[in-house]
Every structure is written in structure tokens, then in C-alpha cells.
């Protein structure tokens, strides 16, 4: 629930600090399992079968698999699609273990992980659907350089990398600031946060949109970007601003109390 009395706002992140080992363990386990799920959707043909069961026409298996690739067994484009899922899981696992101090109950750990898996699965299926897959539109996936010659792939991969690194870096910078006892209760506005108040939100939206762009093309990429942008603009950012306003109000009241009672003497 969101902080405050505004029932229209919903906070997806707990603002209470707690270790929450079980919830975190569930989240980490499911995010790690997602990597294997996404890979097997491609490598074992589960994704192609699912697309066809849903009534779609999938790409041919030879466009997905590459027996000569001893690393993944996939064509270079689908190797990149797998890499996107690895990057998203790794970033979120690192965040929950080394950065986040917020409580994560069992329900949140399961729900947030499931949400990410659903989105990643949709991306994987769209990368296999002949109507949306870059592999079905003449993409040369026999080599990495040839794959990167596609504007959709190169732009998507660049935006994904920048967004993921920006989100992770900004969160580590804020974590380092908060760990200094002298900064207790102070808002952080340095590092990447000096560029934008909600740089981590924008970075997340960027890499999510880029992930979708690489898998499902421009329309799906724009739709995904728009979905997350709208969510953050109408829910995430207002919730955060309300939370920060409450903290400022509490700090102001404490200061007034200290002055009134001569706590600075």
C-alpha cells in the first residue's frame, strides 16, 4: 500500500527496512530459475510449440538453433535474447542481495519475480513469432556482427545496456551515500541522481523497452516503454514524492521539537 492516506496510490516497494530472508530467497531463486526457463523456451523448442498452440506461425527451428555454437547452441540473435534475460535477472539478484534494505515478504518475492518472468516470456515468444521476430524479417543471425548490423538489434542492445548499467550504478551510488552515518535522513542527489531525480526509474523503463524492442520490434518496444513510463509517471513517482514529503514533514516536526526543548544547548 502507498504511504499516506491517498488510497489511489499503490506502492509496490516496502519502505520498511527488514532482512526478510525467506522472501528474498524466493525472489532470488525464481529470478535465477527464469534464466533457465527463458533459455529452454528457445533451445528446446518450447517457445515455438507454444506460439503454434496459440495459433501463430513461428520461425523455423533452424533460425533459432545453431549446432556449431558450442556455447549456447543458438543462433547469435537468440543468444542475445538469452543474454537479455540473464542481465535482467543478474541485476535484480545483485540489487536484492547487496543494495536493497527494504522488507520483502513471501508474497512480494513471488509476485515481483513472476511479473518479470511473464514479461520476459512474452518477449521470448514474440522473438519466435514470425509476425514480430527480427529473425523472420531477413535478419542474418549466423554471426554476431551480422546480427548487430540490424538497427533494431543494435539500438535495442545499446539502450538495454545503458539502461541496465545506469539503474544499477545509481542504486549503488545511493547505497554508498546512505551507509555514511553523517548522511542519515538526508536525500541523495549526487552521482547519476544529479541528472534526474528519478534516474533509476527512467533507466529501468529504458532497458525494459529496449528488451521488448529487440524481441518484438518497434511497436512492442514502444508499447512496453509506454506502459512502464505511464506506471511510473502516474503511480511510482507520486508515491515516492508523497513518501519523501512525509519524511520531510517528520524531520521538520522533530527539529521544531528539539528547538522548543533546547536540544541544541
Q: Predicted segment positions?
A:
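Hydrophobic transmembrane alpha-helices
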Residues: 2-50, 57, 67, 141-173, ...
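Intramembrane catalytic core of multi-pass membrane enzymes that act on lipidic substrates
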Residues: 47-142, 155-161
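Membrane-water interface of transmembrane alpha-helices
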Residues: 90-99, 166-178
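Membrane-interface elements of multi-pass transporters and channels
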Residues: 97, 101-105, 177-181, 247
